[in-house]
Amino acid sequence: MNRIVEVNRLTKEYGRDAAVKDVTFAVEEGKIYGLLGRNGAGKTTIMHMLTAQLFPSSGELKVFGENPYENNRVLSQLCFIKESQRYPDSYRVLDVLKVAASIYPNWDRDLAAQLLEDFRLPLKRRMKKLSRGMLSSVGIIIGLASRAPLTIFDEPYLGLDAVARSLFYERLMQDYAENPRTIMLSTHLIDEVSNMLEHVLVIDQGRLLIDEEAEDLRGKAYTVLGPRAAVESFTAGKNTIHQESIGGMMSVTLLERLDPGDKRRAEAQGLEMIPISMQQLIVHLTQSKSNGKVAEFQ
């Protein structure tokens, strides 16, 4: 597939501290990406560099095959909805959407109107009088209606209840199916979006831990549970990312694809093999990294 973002050894330093360290990855056209990790991991810094809002200290970055900085041809194809998107206080919702329509060449007026109705936004209310959830809804409408070939959402649903978040996911997937584009989601509500993700990038302490297709990742992340001796024997030499024990029982979380022989052996030893959620996987990965136990990711 066509690569629309290419990042090579990207680094961003603030004095002696590096927010992003030697990160390399590519983003392909027509996929939904999850940019995942703990708060302060470097995700937002990466998104700001991808959208030409922050210069890297070193490394190379291309978006749609070009340097994105001061490049209107590239920037007109990007839509970045920030975690706490700010708007002029004097603007009404209607004014903000008019500006967005003038910025994005692919703006879908009908979709914007439908989303306004879905999220029950008052068109003539001034931005400074909107609740936190309403402000998030405005950002969601801009992101979806922009139809930008690369659309990036950074925690886009602050203040939204579960019903409104579910509506966002539903509308996103519906529009993505009808009008494919590349979408990048950065979120801490990983379990809510995990089934939507096609590719996963995991950032921790400024470094890239995982760059993998979501389906492949799901297929090799699981917990082995059973008597301590049997679990220790079965998991010896395997890629362990988390373990805990209670009494004579032990659970070990692995990130490694098993062959049919492994699965038969586990069953013969009376061990349970439990798939883990994407959120559990990210928690275990970043905990093991912060504890100095860096797993290898095959």
Give the residues covered by each predicted segment.
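Helix-to-loop junction immediately C-terminal to a conserved catalytic motif
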Residues: 51
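Conserved ABC transporter NBD signature motif
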Residues: 59-74
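ABC-family P-loop ATPase nucleotide-binding domains
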Residues: 80-138
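Catalytic Walker B motif of ABC-type/P-loop ATPase nucleotide-binding domains
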Residues: 151-155, 160
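ABC transporter nucleotide-binding domain
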Residues: 169-256
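C-terminal coupling/interaction segments
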Residues: 248-298
